[in-house]
């Protein structure tokens, strides 16, 4: 395994995760002022998309680490 390549990919994934987490925090702090949930569907979808991307990136890092350890 090329450890340099693995490290570079891990760093890239981590940068993406940090950006997604920052965006997620902004969305989670959005003031909805009692707006009904059915009107916030777009916000909820975006939050779920960011959560899925973060989770997917976590899985990628775990897989890379497992491959490196073999």
PLM-predicted stretches and their roles:
Residues 12, 16-70:
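Short, charge-rich amphipathic interface segments used for partner binding and complex assembly
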Residues 2-7:
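Long, low-complexity or tandemly repetitive, helically biased scaffold regions used
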């Amino acid at each position: 395994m090329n450890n340099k390549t693995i490290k570079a990919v891990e760093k890239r994934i981590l940068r993406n995760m940090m950006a997604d987490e920052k965006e997620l925090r902004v969305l989670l702090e959005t003031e909805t002022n009692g707006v009904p949930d059915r009107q916030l569907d777009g916000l909820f979808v975006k939050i779920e998309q960011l959560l899925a991307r973060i989770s997917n990136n976590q899985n990628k890092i775990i897989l890379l680490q497992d491959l490196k350890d073999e």
